A protein has these predicted regions:
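Extracytoplasmic beta-strand/coil segments of soluble accessory domains associated
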Residues: 45-84
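Outer-envelope beta-barrel architecture signal
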Residues: 76, 136-140, 170-174
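N-terminal periplasmic accessory domains that precede
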Residues: 44-47, 64-67, 79, 95-98, ...
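Short, acidic, small-residue-rich periplasmic hinge/interaction motif at the N-terminus
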Residues: 1-37, 73
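Short acidic/polar hinge/loop motifs at secondary-structure boundaries
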Residues: 66, 84-113
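Outer-membrane beta-barrel pore domains and translocons
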Residues: 10, 111-113, 130, 143-149, ...
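Periplasmic-side early beta-strands and strand-to-turn transitions of outer-membrane beta-barrels
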Residues: 145, 168-194
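Structural signature of outer-membrane beta-barrel domains
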Residues: 12-14, 73, 85, 147-149, ...
Length: 194
């Protein structure tokens, strides 16, 4: 005998992302965590390559730098919640996107046209990463992934854990996220010197 089956889903993030994209005055792509979670992307660099108009530069097999509209990566700006992210390298503006775990981001906003309310230092466009907010109900999420790098002949491991809750009559919200990525890289490299 067939029992009742109830299937539920939460697409609020995707609905908000589509509304934000539709109501934008400029050319803007918004991708929610719902969409990012459909793919096995361990970092933001991997998630960005799925957005139209975005290209990523690879370094040692990792999607490291984001390019907007075909311009160089240092002609685009990267912000987290609207605050500028500095480069880990001292001589360039490129932001290493492979260092930012995808589990910690709620929404990716890609502005392909700089508007008057934005800094005028991003010729290609800007990438804004919006972090997760604390939910109104307890939220626990764990992810795990593994792989094998044939060049370095070593195993890869990706782990993620996210916890969110509100306390004291919803006056204090907490969102904790931890991520571990062990990706032993290796490359077959040939460089020519002229």
């Amino acid at each position: 005998e067939l029992q009742e089956v109830v299937v539920g889903g939460a697409f609020q993030g995707q609905r908000r992302a589509i509304n934000s994209q539709k109501n934008s005055l400029g050319i803007k792509n918004v991708v929610s965590a719902d969409q990012v979670g459909k793919f096995p992307d361990s970092n933001i660099g991997d998630a960005l390559k799925r957005i139209s108009g975005i290209n990523v530069q690879y370094d040692q097999g990792e999607a490291r730098f984001g390019q907007v509209r075909g311009t160089s990566a240092d002609m685009s700006s990267v912000t987290i919640n609207g605050n500028r992210v500095p480069s880990a390298e001292g001589d360039t503006r490129n932001v290493q996107l492979d260092l930012i775990p995808a589990d910690m981001i709620q929404t990716i906003e890609v502005n392909k046209v700089v508007t008057p309310d934005m800094d005028a230092d991003a010729i290609g466009g800007s990438i804004n990463l919006v972090t997760k907010n604390s939910p109104y109900k307890r939220f626990i999420s764990a992810t795990a992934g593994t792989g094998y790098n044939w060049i370095s002949d070593k195993a890869q491991l990706n782990l993620g854990f996210t916890y969110g809750d509100r306390f004291f009559n919803d006056k204090l919200g907490v969102m904790l996220s931890a991520s571990y990525q062990n990706s032993p890289s290796g490359s077959d490299d040939v460089e020519f010197v002229w």
